[in-house]
Structures are given as structure tokens and as C-alpha cells.
Swiss-Prot record:
Part of the 30S ribosomal subunit. It comes from Pinus thunbergii. Its main location: plastid. NCBIfam families: rpsG_bact. Belongs to the universal ribosomal protein uS7 family. Signal peptide: none annotated. Keywords: Chloroplast, Plastid, Ribonucleoprotein, Ribosomal protein, RNA-binding, rRNA-binding. CDD domains: uS7_Chloroplast (cd14871). It comes from the Eukaryota. It is found in: Plastid, Chloroplast. One of the primary rRNA binding proteins, it binds directly to 16S rRNA where it nucleates assembly of the head domain of the 30S subunit. This is Small ribosomal subunit protein uS7c. It holds the Pfam family Ribosomal_S7. HAMAP family: Ribosomal_uS7_B.
């Protein structure tokens, strides 16, 4: 039995403008090479673009996009007796949210064009509507989990 106490869960801080933890989680995922001010600028411009295009609350669009992309199950590779099985496992809501943010940003980076805030805003709007590459990624993951349901007992 370990003598160490369990580590406390770190809670995400809220961002300076919207005072929202979800916005800060997205900013930390956009971050490259420690340029946080650039990451904030990209997200805030994307949010402004969403507001101009949809006339809705951009934070609700962001929340809805993340909710739509968040997966319920994922597949993990598990090695049993020399062969590798893709085992479907349920994931917690926080891990699902992290995966959703990662997929949204990956899909927006792959979009054609040069401007990241433009690509991110369009990907968020598409995901909120229920289409886009991030939604496709979620559906693909769910299909993989459904196809490998026979291996669920390997958990």
C-alpha cells in the first residue's frame, strides 16, 4: 500500500475576458511553443467571427459544438496473447471533453485556408450544426467501438 496521498485534481482556470473554464481549456489546446497570447487572440477572433455570422451567443455555440463532438466510448489497444485487440471503453465526461476539443482543433487545422481563427470559427459552427470533420471523427470512433463490442470483456 502506498504511503503517498492521492494527488489533487487540477481544475482549469477561467479566461480573463469571458471568465469561462471551457474557453481556457480550448486556449491551452491551441497553444504552440508557449505563445499563449497568440492562442487567446486566435480564439477570441474566432468567437467574434461566430457572433457576426450567427447572431447567437458564441459561447453557447462553443458549448454546443463541444457537446456534439464529445464521445461516450473510445477504443483502446489491448494486447492479449500475442495479438492486439481494440477494446471499447467508456470514458468520463472530462476526458470526453478533452478529446472533443482535440478533435475540433485537429479538424480546423486540416481545413483549407491560411487563417486559423477563420478555420476554427467555421469548424465550431459546423460542429454545432451537427456536421464537419470533428463530428465525423466522433462517429468513426463510435463505429469502431460498436464493431469491436465482442472484445469488451477484455477490459
Amino acid at each position: 500500500m502506498s504511503r503517498r496521498s492521492t494527488a489533487e485534481k487540477k481544475t482549469a482556470k477561467s479566461d480573463p475576458i469571458y471568465h469561462n473554464r471551457l474557453v481556457n481549456m480550448v486556449v491551452n489546446r491551441i497553444l504552440k511553443n508557449g505563445k499563449k497570447s497568440l492562442a487567446y487572440r486566435i480564439l477570441y477572433r474566432a468567437i467574434k467571427k461566430i457572433q457576426q455570422k450567427t447572431d447567437k451567443n458564441p459561447l453557447s455555440v462553443l458549448r454546443q459544438a463541444i457537446r456534439r463532438v464529445t464521445p461516450n466510448v473510445t477504443v483502446k489497444a489491448r494486447r492479449v496473447g500475442g495479438s492486439t485487440y481494440r477494446v471499447p471503453t467508456e470514458i468520463r465526461s472530462t476526458q470526453g471533453k478533452v478529446l472533443a476539443i482535440r478533435w475540433l482543433l485537429g479538424a480546423s487545422r486540416k481545413r483549407p485556408g491560411r487563417n486559423m481563427n477563420f478555420k476554427l470559427s467555421h469548424e465550431l459552427m459546423d460542429a454545432a450544426r451537427g456536421n464537419g470533420n470533428a463530428i465525423r471523427k466522433k462517429e468513426e470512433t463510435h463505429r469502431m467501438a460498436e464493431a469491436n463490442r465482442a472484445f469488451a470483456h477484455f477490459r
